[in-house]
């Protein structure tokens, strides 16, 4: 069964889902990510970065966020479903990208990365760091320093506002054999 939803304005694919039986897996997660990036690029979604994925029943769902000048823009999200038996794209969901994509001002950084680190838990072992735009609960966006780190055996994402130095959000990263998600 193939289900497709097309936007009235612009005729963009908002949602597509195709169901079929999945055979034995022969495509790796890494190869599926490459296939996904090529698919997105060929359909006009440029500068997309894999952020999270989940494997279920022979299909991997990969979240891709737009990247502008090295800043990960999480509101501009596209989700792809890729079959792990043959690499076929079986689904796409573009609502986040279609509703939010625009050029952002990513130069309004008033707090240095080092200043932002001062607000972190001293027990946090930093694994990676960079800039990201995240959505807020008030339907706006904020430019933040994103720190991926670990305390004991738990991984976290900590977001520090790049303009005010205020902690905006903390997410727990859940690593499972089937993928990486946050909550």
Locations of the language-model features?
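Long, terminal "pre-/pro-" and other extracytoplasmic accessory regions
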Residues: 1-183
């Amino acid at each position: 069964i193939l289900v497709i939803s097309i936007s009235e304005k612009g005729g963009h694919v908002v949602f597509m889902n195709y169901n079929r039986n999945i055979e034995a897996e022969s495509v790796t997660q890494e190869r599926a990510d490459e296939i996904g990036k090529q698919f997105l690029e060929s359909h006009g979604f440029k500068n997309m970065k894999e952020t999270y994925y989940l494997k279920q029943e022979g299909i991997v769902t990969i979240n891709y966020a737009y990247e502008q000048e090295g800043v990960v823009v999480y509101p501009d999200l596209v989700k792809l479903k890729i079959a792990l038996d043959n690499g076929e794209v079986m689904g796409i969901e573009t609502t986040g990208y279609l509703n939010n994509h625009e050029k952002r001002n990513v130069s309004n950084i008033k707090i240095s990365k080092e200043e932002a680190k001062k607000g972190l838990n001293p027990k946090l072992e930093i694994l990676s760091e960079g800039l990201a735009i995240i959505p807020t609960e008030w339907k706006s966006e904020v430019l933040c320093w994103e720190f991926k780190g670990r305390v004991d055996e738990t991984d976290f994402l900590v977001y520090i506002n790049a303009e005010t130095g205020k902690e905006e959000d903390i997410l727990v990263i859940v690593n499972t054999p089937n993928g990486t998600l946050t909550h």
